[in-house]
Amino acid sequence: MSSGAKEGGGGSPAYHLPHPHPHPPQHAQYVGPYRLEKTLGKGQTGLVKLGVHCITGQKVAIKIVNREKLSESVLMKVEREIAILKLIEHPHVLKLHDVYENKKYLYLVLEHVSGGELFDYLVKKGRLTPKEARKFFRQIVSALDFCHSYSICHRDLKPENLLLDEKNNIRIADFGMASLQVGDSLLETSCGSPHYACPEVIKGEKYDGRRADMWSCGVILFALLVGALPFDDDNLRQLLEKVKRGVFHMPHFIPPDCQSLLRGMIEVEPEKRLSLEQIQKHPWYLGGKHEPDPCLEPAPGRRVAMRSLPSNGELDPDVLESMASLGCFRDRERLHRELRSEEENQEKMIYYLLLDRKERYPSCEDQDLPPRNDVDPPRKRVDSPMLSRHGKRRPERKSMEVLSITDAGGGGSPVPTRRALEMAQHSQRSRSVSGASTGLSSSPLSSPRSPVFSFSPEPGAGDEARGGGSPTSKTQTLPSRGPRGGGAGEQPPPPSARSTPLPGPPGSPRSSGGTPLHSPLHTPRASPTGTPGTTPPPSPGGGVGGAAWRSRLNSIRNSFLGSPRFHRRKMQVPTAEEMSSLTPESSPELAKRSWFGNFISLDKEEQIFLVLKDKPLSSIKADIVHAFLSIPSLSHSVLSQTSFRAEYKASGGPSVFQKPVRFQVDISSSEGPEPSPRRDGSGGGGIYSVTFTLISGPSRRFKRVVETIQAQLLSTHDQPSVQALADEKNGAQTRPAGAPPRSLQPPPGRPDPELSSSPRRGPPKDKKLLATNGTPLP
C-alpha cells in the first residue's frame, strides 16, 4: 500500500508528532510541508524527488516540472494528466495528492511506492511463474476496467509504467498519454511504444483506445510469462512490420489455457480481440480466484448523483477548468448546454465526479509550514469558493498564511505586508480542483519554442489530432508526442482567466554554468544563465540577438520510442552521490530510470551544427536519409518534414553493456521561410542549418556517428566555404583541405568498424535472442 496519508488534505493534522529527523539539514528545500530529499529518477518532463512531511514523516514522490524549459503543448499534457488523475481513485493506480507551483516550477505531489518498476523487477528476476504473473495481470486488468468505465484510455501501458509497492502490488503510473474516449468516437493519435502498440496504431488508422490497451496488456502478460517480448527487432522498421503481421512464437512452457488468452489479446483484428469483459471471464484469469489476495478485490465504483443544473445556476469554475484541460470539452457553449440538460450524459458524469472529488478532498492553504527563506517558494493550488450541487456559493477557506505572512524576503528582512499581498494575489489566480488545470497554454512562463505537439480535439473525443500526415512505410514510427507543426485542425485552447504569470520576485537563483570546451562542430549548451548562482535569471520573454536561433535549437527532445529489452538490459541503480542531490539543476544525468517514461536530459544539450548552401530542402532530406541507411545498426524515424529521430546500436560485445546513441536531426532555413531561388532557376536553394541534438547515449560515439553522416552530406556537395562556416559557427578551427573527417579516424583502442563513409554490403548477422531460461528463441 501507499505510504501516503489521506489525499489532498486541507491542512496539518490537529496533533503534532516529533520531527522524524531531530537535526534537519540547514539548507533543506521544501515544497509546502514536504522536505525534498534524494532523487528517485529523471523523466522527460522533469525530476522525481522523494518528499518527507516535516511533521508526520509521510513520504511522497514529487515530480518537478520546469515550465521554462518545456513548450506550451507539453505543459498542456501535464495539466491533462493532472485532471485525469483526479478522476481515478483505484488501489492499483498511482494517486495524486496535491499540486504546488511557483514562477519557474510545477510540483506534482504523488503517492510514493518503494518497489520500483515492474521493468526492473523482470530484469532482476527473469520470467515469472504463472501464479505470480496472474496476480500482476489481474491487478492491471482491474485498474484498466475502472479507467475504461470512465472513458479513460491509458495508451502507453508497458512494464516501465507499472510500479510496485512494498507488498509487490501494481500501481499504474504515467497517464501523460491517456485520453478520454467519449461515446463511440475513435482516437487518431499514434502514440505509445512500438513493442507494446497495436497494429492499427502503427498503421496510423483511427482506433478504439480500449482495444489498444488490451493489446498492450497481452504483450505485458507475454513478457511476464516468457521474460522476452513477442515482437522484437534491432531495426525499428522490421519491428513495426512484425507487429503489423502479429505473428509471434508461443513457448511450450506457457499453460494451454493461457496460450488461448494470449492469442485472443494479441489479435491483429481489433473486432476479434478480446474485450475486458471477455478477459475477466476467461478460465485462466478465473483460475486464481481461490488464491487469497485482498488486493485483487474489485474497487468500489464512485457513484455520484447527476442532477440537472438550473439554467441560471452557477457552474464551478475549477471543475470547468479541469474539464477544459481534458481536451474534449473545449466548446464551452455545448458543455454548458449538456450540463443543464435533463438527460444523463458524459459531460455531467465527468462534472459531478470532479465536483465530488473537490468536496471530499478540499485543497486549502497549508498551515504550520516550516520557516522559508526562498525568494519564490512553491505555493499550493487551492480551491476557489466551492459551489454546492444547487449552484450556491459556499464561504471561502483562508489560512493564516494568507492573513498574516511573516516569511522573510530575499534579503532576509521580514516584509509581511508585501508578501501578504503577493500571496493573496497568487491564491486568487491559482485556484483549481486540488491541482486541476490552470490554463497554462497562454502563459508567458512557458518556453517560446515552436510547439512540438499537436493538440486538436477530435469530434467528440479527447485525443490530439494527428498532424504532418502519416509516416512513410520505410520510416514509420510511433511518435510519443505529435509531430512538429500540425494539421489544419489545430487550434489553441481558449484563453484562461488564470493564465497570467504568477506574481513574485524575478526568479530563483540558478546554478552556475561552466564554459564549454569547443571541439570541431560540437557545442555543449551551458546553463540557462551562464552566471554565478546568486544572479537572478533573465526574464523568460527577454532576449538578445540570436533569440530565434536559441528557441529553434532548444526545441524539446522527445525520448526515442521503444523500450530496451528487459531480458537484455541490466538494472540501473543510482550511486550514493547521485541520490544525495537536492536541487533540480544539480541532479544526476544518469539517475535511475524514472517512473514517468523514457528519459532525456533537460539540463544540458550536446549539439552539432552543419550549414549547407545552395541545396534544395528535398535534396538535403534525401542525403540525410541515404546517410542513415548506409550506416549499419542505425535506425531512424520521421518526426516531421524537417525532423528525424535516429538510434545507433554498436554491434559486438554483450549488448547489455552497450548503451545506444539516440539523437534528433532538425533542418532549419537560415534565410527565413522563403529561401532565395537557385541560380539555375530551379528554385528551392538557400542556406540551411542541420542540427544534430544528442538525446541519450555516449557523447563520443555520438560525435563519430554525426561526423560520418556529415562526411556523406558534404561529399555529395563540394562546398569548402560552407564547411568553414560551420566550423566557425561552432567555435572550432577550420579543417585543412583534403583532411579526412574525424569519423574516419577512430580513437586508439576503440575501433568502430561500422562507422564508415561507405555502406557495408549485406545485412548484419542476426543475433539469437535468449530467453531467461537460456533457450534460443527463433
From Swiss-Prot:
Localization, UniProt: Cytoplasm; Nucleus; Cytoplasm, Cytoskeleton, Microtubule organizing center, Centrosome; Synapse
Cofactor(s) listed in the protein's UniProt record: Mg(2+)
Binding annotation for ATP: L40, G41, K42, G43, Q44, T45, G46, L47, V48, K63
Entry's Gene Ontology BP terms: associative learning; axonogenesis; central nervous system neuron differentiation; centrosome duplication; DNA damage response; establishment of cell polarity; G2/M transition of mitotic cell cycle; microtubule cytoskeleton organization involved in establishment of planar polarity
Consequence recorded when altering R303W: In a gastric adenocarcinoma sample; somatic mutation
UniProt biased composition (Low complexity): 430-457, 509-533
Major subcellular location class: cytoplasm
Residues annotated as transmembrane: none
PTM: Phosphorylated at Thr-189 by STK11/LKB1 in complex with STE20-related adapter-alpha (STRADA) pseudo kinase and CAB39. Not phosphorylated at Thr-189 by CaMKK2. In contrast, it is phosphorylated and activated by CaMKK1. May be inactivated via dephosphorylation of Thr-189 by PP2C.
Region listing for Disordered, in residue ranges: 1-29, 362-548, 719-778
EC number: 2.7.11.1, 2.7.11.26
Protein source organism: Homo sapiens (Human)
Segments of skewed composition (Pro residues): 491-508
Family to which the UniProt record says this protein belongs: Belongs to the protein kinase superfamily. CAMK Ser/Thr protein kinase family. SNF1 subfamily.
GO molecular function annotations of the record: ATP binding; gamma-tubulin binding; magnesium ion binding; protein kinase binding; protein serine kinase activity; protein serine/threonine kinase activity; tau protein binding; tau-protein kinase activity
Comp. bias intervals (Gly residues): 1-12
Protein name: Serine/threonine-protein kinase BRSK1
Positions of modified residues (Phosphoserine): S399, S443, S447, S450, S508, S586, S587, S601
Protein purpose: Serine/threonine-protein kinase that plays a key role in polarization of neurons and centrosome duplication. Phosphorylates CDC25B, CDC25C, MAPT/TAU, RIMS1, TUBG1, TUBG2 and WEE1. Following phosphorylation and activation by STK11/LKB1, acts as a key regulator of polarization of cortical neurons, probably by mediating phosphorylation of microtubule-associated proteins such as MAPT/TAU at 'Thr-529' and 'Ser-579'. Also regulates neuron polarization by mediating phosphorylation of WEE1 at 'Ser-642' in postmitotic neurons, leading to down-regulate WEE1 activity in polarized neurons.
Regulation: Activated by phosphorylation on Thr-189 by STK11/LKB1.
Modified residues (Omega-N-methylarginine): R466, R481, R484, R498, R525, R550
UBA domain location: 314-356
Active-site residues, record numbering mapped to chain: D156
Sites bearing Phosphothreonine, chain numbering: T189, T529, T535, T583
This protein's record includes keyword Kinase: yes
Tissue: Widely expressed, with highest levels in brain and testis. Protein levels remain constant throughout the cell cycle.
GO cellular component terms attached to this protein's record: cell junction; centrosome; cholinergic synapse; cytoplasm; distal axon; nucleoplasm; nucleus; postsynaptic density
